[in-house]
């Protein structure tokens, strides 16, 4: 599990006007920490450090340490609000985590073995990724950055489902807790859709130059 640390300051100046001033200064990002037994805490984050952190995919599936004026807060990112047309983050939401309580979180899927995939390499199929991430439940200390999906032995016409994913100890898939009918496909190999020449030729023969049906 990656360890991310961000420095933050308590945000005393609140409201829309304060948020606009903060954006105009272009040095800080407004955010809030909530959850647990503590009250919600508005904060500001140093912009360049935060922007660098969110470039890393693992940031969104990791426990993050926020150093709030000398006090440590263990959190996960819950939401990022972006400007509608500028490349700016306008606000971020962080949720406190308790080491003894499970959390639910979406983690990305990393597909391995694409080039060696049996259904693609030997059977001329096409690999289809049906899900880019999955929702898991675990203790904060067990949170994986991602889950691996090995497609090396996946053959033509076959599908890997949620139940086929290897999970780290202490990690479960939220969807499967709702029953077998939620065992969705994650990746599959199907026959390449090359089209049929007959269909195209038939379309040309179906009408004459005047648009009337040919015999």
UniProtKB/Swiss-Prot annotation:
One GO MF term attached to the UniProt entry: structural constituent of ribosome
GO biological process: translation
Acidic residues bias locations: 196-215
Secretion signal span: none
Matches recorded under CDD domains: Ribosomal_L25_TL5_CTC
GO cellular-component term (any): cytosolic large ribosomal subunit
InterPro entries registered for this protein in UniProt: Rbsml_bL25/Gln-tRNA_synth_N, Ribosomal_bL25/Gln-tRNA_synth, Ribosomal_bL25_b-dom, Ribosomal_bL25_C, Ribosomal_bL25_long, Ribosomal_L25_dom, Ribosomal_uL5_bac-type
UniProt keywords, alphabetically: Ribonucleoprotein, Ribosomal protein, RNA-binding, rRNA-binding
Gene3D superfamilies per UniProt: Ribosomal protein L25, beta domain, Ribosomal Protein L25, Chain P
Region annotated Disordered, chain positions: 191-215
Function: This is one of the proteins that binds to the 5S RNA in the ribosome where it forms part of the central protuberance.
Oligomer and partners: Part of the 50S ribosomal subunit; part of the 5S rRNA/L5/L18/L25 subcomplex. Contacts the 5S rRNA. Binds to the 5S rRNA independently of L5 and L18.
Family named by the database record: Belongs to the bacterial ribosomal protein bL25 family. CTC subfamily.
Protein name: Large ribosomal subunit protein bL25
Species in which this protein is naturally found: Chromohalobacter salexigens (strain ATCC BAA-138 / DSM 3043 / CIP 106854 / NCIMB 13768 / 1H11)
